[in-house]
């Protein structure tokens, strides 16, 4: 286990001459790797000063890329210094909306009533023609 760093300490290392990242609670000095990174140094620099675990995992790095992290390890992060993420929960929607049901019935009637009238007119016309 290495030295314990706070988020503020790690955040100071945020340029191309001194770049540290936090991934899975560990701190890595990736300054020497900036030029070799396949995505370019901008990708790594944009992940400084925060927990970059999600950014790292979302890319889907290979097992060899994950193994490379060991050579850049400098310590661990003090988890109490990382602000907790607030998870967004959408507001609950009612499963049944009586207002929408009323609108549906009105639209259904607006469609069916003319059809019934048309069917009645055709039926009357057909009935009166065949009896004459």
UniProtKB/Swiss-Prot annotation:
UniProt keyword list: Electron transport, Endoplasmic reticulum, Heme, Iron, Membrane, Metal-binding, Microsome, Transmembrane, Transmembrane helix, Transport
Keyword set includes Mitochondrion: no
Principal location listed in the UniProt entry: endoplasmic reticulum
PROSITE patterns linked: CYTOCHROME_B5_1, CYTOCHROME_B5_2
Keyword Iron: yes
UniProt topology in membrane: Single-pass membrane protein
Domain of life where this protein originates: Eukaryota
Gene Ontology cellular-component annotations: endoplasmic reticulum membrane
Binding locations of heme: 37, 61
Residue ranges of the TM segments: 104-124
Ranges in coiled-coil conformation: none
Cellular localisation: Endoplasmic reticulum membrane; Microsome membrane
GO molecular function: heme binding; metal ion binding
Ranges for domain Cytochrome b5 heme-binding: 2-78
InterPro entries membership: Cyt_B5-like_heme/steroid-bd (IPR001199), Cyt_B5-like_heme/steroid_sf (IPR036400), Cyt_B5_heme-BS (IPR018506), Cytochrome_b5 (IPR050668)
Family of the protein in this entry: Belongs to the cytochrome b5 family.
General function of this protein: Membrane bound hemoprotein which function as an electron carrier for several membrane bound oxygenases.
Identification of the protein by name: Cytochrome b5
Organism: Borago officinalis
């Amino acid at each position: 286990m290495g030295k314990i760093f706070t988020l503020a300490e790690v955040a100071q290392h945020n340029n191309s001459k001194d770049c540290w990242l936090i991934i899975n609670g560990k701190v890595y000095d990736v300054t020497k790797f900036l030029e070799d990174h396949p995505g370019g140094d901008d990708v790594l620099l944009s992940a400084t000063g925060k927990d970059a675990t999600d950014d790292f995992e979302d890319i889907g790095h290979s097992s060899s890329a994950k193994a490379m992290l060991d050579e850049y390890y400098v310590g661990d992060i003090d988890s109490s210094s990382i602000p907790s993420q607030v998870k967004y929960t959408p507001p609950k929607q009612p499963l049944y909306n009586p207002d929408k049901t009323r609108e549906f019935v009105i639209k259904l009637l607006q469609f069916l009533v003319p059809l019934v009238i048309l069917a009645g007119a055709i039926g009357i016309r057909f009935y009166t023609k065949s009896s004459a």
